[in-house]
Structures are given as structure tokens and as C-alpha cells.
Amino acid sequence: MSICHQEGELARAKKIDVAEQGLCCPSLVEAPLGEAEAASLADVLGALADPVRLRLLSIVVSEREICSCNLERPLGKSQPTVSHHTRVLSEAGLLVGEKRGRWVWWRVDEARLAEVRKALGG
């Protein structure tokens, strides 16, 4: 039984069965991760552990698809730096790039993002 010490009017100083009440502190995963799942998730989380990459991913998610040439200004980073960060996110499976002329257009790999959300319990 998962126990949460919730504060406030509802349960001041009471112990609440989280599973029964559906309240705070849910576990991140329903079952232990296998070795391959843990390694894959660690790669993704490592890629997201950088604030620039996290911002970059949020920009791509909000735009649905964006040219790498349009990432420099909002990130405040040079083209080589943007390329480095998009490569890391691409290698982690979060971004998919398509070369169009001299630029790469980026979009989020929705299936991979869904896998990550599921692994984290979301």
C-alpha cells in the first residue's frame, strides 16, 4: 500500500491510501524496467538533461515542424551549436530530420515521445 502524507483541509495529519484515493505521489512506472528499456530511457533522459535541448524540443513540439535555420534566434545559439543539439536529440530518437535543399526540417517523433511518456508513467 502506497502511503502519502497529504496536507490541507482534506486530510490534515492523515495517512491516505494513494491507490484507493488516486491522489498524490503515484509511482513513475508500473513495473520495473528491463535492461534494454532502462538503457534506452537513460539515453533519452540524458539528451533532455541539457536546458538548450529541452527548450529546442519544446520549440519543435509547439511548431510541429521547423527549419533548423529558424532555431538559432529563439535559442540564442549559433548554427553549429543548434546542429549539435538537434543531432543529440535525433540520436536519442526524439527528433526526425528531413533535408530540404541546404536546410534540415525537424519534427518530433511522436511514437518515441509516447514511449518515453509511458515509461515515466505519464
Predicted features and spans:
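N-terminal helix-turn-helix DNA-binding core of bacterial DNA-binding proteins
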Residues: 35-78, 100, 104-112
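N-terminal leader segment of winged-helix/HTH proteins
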Residues: 1-48, 92-94, 114-115, 119-120
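Histidine-centered divalent metal-coordination motifs
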Residues: 53, 84-85
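Alpha-helical residues within the helix-turn-helix
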Residues: 72-73, 84, 90-91
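Intrinsic low-complexity/disordered segments
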Residues: 2-3, 76, 81-82
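Short hinge/loop at the helix->beta-strand junction immediately C-terminal to the helix-turn-helix recognition helix
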Residues: 65, 88, 93-94
